[in-house]
């Protein structure tokens, strides 16, 4: 789960407390394009966003009854995997979760991903609380890029991380974990504030992942989007 919390006027962020310094630095880069993305659901339905982004189709237009686009797909479909694959790219999907969830193991094959890598395929998983860390996934993306380079091929990789998955309870990262406070203009309950602090910590780690990957690819000769 990720969003730019600095877009919301109810928060009192400062330069020191900004949870997204890497994102904001990247937005100011003269070569960067930035904006807002509208996703097909709120607080759930991750696979629907994946489907929309990869196919250009809209989950909301597929079925009035289906809760997930992935449960509607049952055959080969055009997607970015096929577009890039046709141009000789190595294409891959990474997700540190269960392959059966949202039927991803079949759907990504139907979407044309050359390689699918799930938690069961990964070694020495690193966790922060219950979920695999974003930093661990950044390392796998770097390794996948190196593999593509060694093959003499460009790479299209789509990774769905999981660290900031719900729930956002105070014990998410273990008893005694101290979350940086989140200052707001609104009067909110202690429970709501606690959830915000937990969620923001995950957003902060996602931004750190972005910073790591930006620094890594900035040192590469190959052009990277």
Feature-to-residue mapping (PLM):
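Solvent-exposed soluble domains appended to multi-pass membrane proteins
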Residues: 1-225
């Amino acid at each position: 789960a990720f969003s730019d919390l600095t877009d919301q006027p109810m928060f009192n962020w400062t330069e020191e407390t900004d949870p997204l310094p890497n994102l904001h630095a990247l937005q100011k880069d003269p070569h960067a394009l930035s904006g807002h993305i509208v996703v097909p659901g709120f607080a759930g339905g991750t696979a629907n966003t994946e489907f929309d982004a990869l196919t250009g189709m809209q989950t909301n237009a597929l079925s009035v009854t289906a809760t997930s686009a992935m449960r509607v797909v049952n055959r080969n479909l055009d997607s970015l995997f096929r577009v890039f694959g046709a141009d000789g790219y190595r294409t891959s999907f990474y997700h540190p979760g269960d392959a059966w969830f949202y039927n991803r193991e079949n759907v990504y094959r139907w979407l044309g991903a050359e390689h699918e890598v799930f938690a069961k395929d990964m070694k020495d998983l690193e966790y922060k609380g219950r979920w695999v860390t974003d930093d661990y996934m950044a390392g796998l993306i770097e390794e996948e890029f190196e593999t593509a380079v060694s093959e003499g091929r460009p790479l299209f990789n789509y990774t769905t991380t999981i660290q900031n998955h719900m729930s956002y309870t105070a014990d998410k990262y273990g008893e005694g974990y101290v979350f940086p406070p989140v200052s707001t203009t609104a009067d909110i309950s202690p429970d709501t504030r606690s959830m915000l602090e937990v969620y923001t910590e995950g957003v902060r780690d996602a931004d750190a992942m972005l910073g790591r990957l930006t620094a890594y690819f900035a040192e590469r000769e190959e052009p990277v989007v």
